Amino acid sequence: MAFDFKKEYKEFYLPKAKPALVTVPPMNYLAVRGKGDPNEENGAYQQAIGLLYGVAYTIKMSKKGDHRIEGYFDYVVPPLEGFWQQEGTDATDAIDYAHKEQFVWVSVIRLPDFVTKADFAWAVQEAAAKKKQDFSAVEFLTVEEGLCVQCMHIGPYDREPETVAAMD
């Protein structure tokens, strides 16, 4: 059975409806940085998602090709995640949802630990060759968040501030 990050790391991927502390260890990601309204049709955010999944599935399906990744095991591609901020603010400032065009984001998909920077570079080149598309915006990113507060937000994005306030 394929390794499923959501099931194996429930504390990170299935947060409770009430705020809770969690220590997030260093993790490697595929990442694309951008700016703008994520709801814009064919906008930068939509394009970033396509790039991320293109490389993510190239790595996952490497088992069927000539490129062998040491330590590879079958897995479910982890969910899309993101780090959001608004232009001209810092991480502690509230987001103004009326101005989504000012969003600055880093969209990410977690990588299994067996994926090296060399495997990542191969996957970017392979995806570009197969899809006839530029994947140079995709980067290998290591993030160590450390001690965090998390809470499942249920509802429209415009009501997210209520969930964030509950974590204060």
Report the location of each language-model feature:
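A solvent-exposed interaction/effector surface
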Residues: 1-168
